[in-house]
Amino acid sequence: GEHYGDKTPNEIFKLTEDFDADTLVKTLKEAGFKKLIVTAKHHDGFCIWASEATQYDVSGATNYQGGKGDVLADISKACTEHDMDMGLYLSPWDIHDESYGYKDASGKALVEFVDTNNDGKPDKNQPVNGLTWEQVKQQDAKDYNKYYNDQLIEILGNDKYGNKGHFKEVWMDGAKGSGAGYQEYDFKKWFDTIQQYEGIAGNQVDDCMLFGAEAYTTVRWIGNENGFAAEETWSKSNV
């Protein structure tokens, strides 16, 4: 089966004040690692930094460091100290935040997953009650794309995050559970925000590498989650 977390208050986050980011990063550095990609938010929506966009974070939902903790800042400080490049993993799919999906002001869904083949198997998302997609977006009470973009700005626009305030890569995991609500992602908007802070547009030497950003992707997945890749991994291209 599938399990990506739930919407209950975070009661399993038992990180103590003994968390030692410095030893973690130092050990990785000594082992030969050149970059540390930090999962700042996974599919469950819990944020390991002090986010202004939600209370479902390390400062609002846990007692870590008296409710004033910021794990991403701790790791960033250590990466800066040991000059370890950083990548940011920020899951687009979010099962916790109410802005995910399309709902009106009363919380009623504006999109439904329907059976268009009359075979008893739902196969397509479509607007309810004959609405157009444009009307769905107009009636959507909360804009998830803005929520996600605001969190990108919170992190990428704050010099306390990253190695010396900089991230080399942003990882957008494309996973989405079978029961996930329908949500279109504004990759263009997110791409512009990322490069504004971490790319050539932000006076960096190179553009930030992106994974899982559809047409804007620059980092290819090796095809498994086992950590193994062939010595030569070719990517097809239509010439």
Where are the model-predicted features located?
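Mature catalytic domains of secreted/periplasmic carbohydrate-active enzymes
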Residues: G1-V239
